[in-house]
Amino acid sequence: MTNWKPLVSVITPSYNARDYIEDTVHSVLDQSHPHWEMIIVDDCSTDGTRDILQQYEKIDERIHVVYLEENSGAAVARNKALERAQGRYVAFLDSDDKWKKDKLEKQLEFMMERSCAFSFTGYSLMAQDGTPLDKFIHAPESLTYDDALKNTIIGCLTVMIDREQTGQIQMPNIRTRQDLATWLSLLKKGFTAYGMNECLAEYRLVNNSISSNKWKAAKKTWFVYREIERLHFMKATWCFVQYAKNAVKKRL
């Protein structure tokens, strides 16, 4: 890899993640690319997560924790972290997921070779208790705006963005699917999302999460189509059918 070592800001919203947050933080501490800062925004956790975060903030000066005064949702938490981020590159990692140790290094090299602004990678699934599942979510070579409307394949935990090219990023203030809306917003501006088809992250299937409830996820996707993207009913319906087909394929 080039000797240039850019700073990557890791954006992590946290809420009642006591059982998982240590795995998440350690996956960042173990990165082969050492030039990162991790900005964790805690959304009023009540389960002891804050006590754990305070300890990690003392252990490594690259870890910064922000405590929200009222429960506001992941969009507000991520935006607060993005406001404080100092890195040219930003990467997203939720408080129950993990990265492979060379994730940042490999993805940075991938982006610099292509001079691309927006990239994502493949990832694997794990059970709620951390047991690896025999399932790999592949990353297509590239996605345009129209592609992403039909195939919501981009895993938030795999995304890296070059803000020198995209400008500042802010997620829409909606409770769920704000990540999808953000990717669509970038792609709509003409950027292409480039996929690195290598497993560089692990996504935890938490039983009470929106993503684990397929019906809720589908409803929120429809909301993004109609209320955020303002798609005509017929186009939204067509995109939704394609989304549903691809969602089924992804789980096979």
From Swiss-Prot:
* One annotated GO biological process: teichuronic acid biosynthetic process
| Transmembrane annotation, as ranges | none
**InterPro entries given for it?**
Glyco_trans_2-like, Nucleotide-diphossugar_trans
Per the entry, induction is: By phosphate starvation, via the PhoP/PhoR two-component regulatory system.
Query: Mind listing the GO molecular function terms for this protein?
Result: glycosyltransferase activity; hexosyltransferase activity
Q: Which UniProt keywords apply?
A: Cell wall biogenesis/degradation, Glycosyltransferase, Stress response, Transferase
Please indicate which superkingdom the organism of origin belongs to.
Bacteria
Cite the NCBIfam families for this sequence.
TeichurnBiosyTuaG
Which PANTHER family does its entry note?
GLYCOSYLTRANSFERASE, UDP-GLCNAC:BETAGAL BETA-1,3-N-ACETYLGLUCOSAMINYLTRANSFERASE-LIKE PROTEIN 1
Protein's recorded name: Putative teichuronic acid biosynthesis glycosyltransferase TuaG
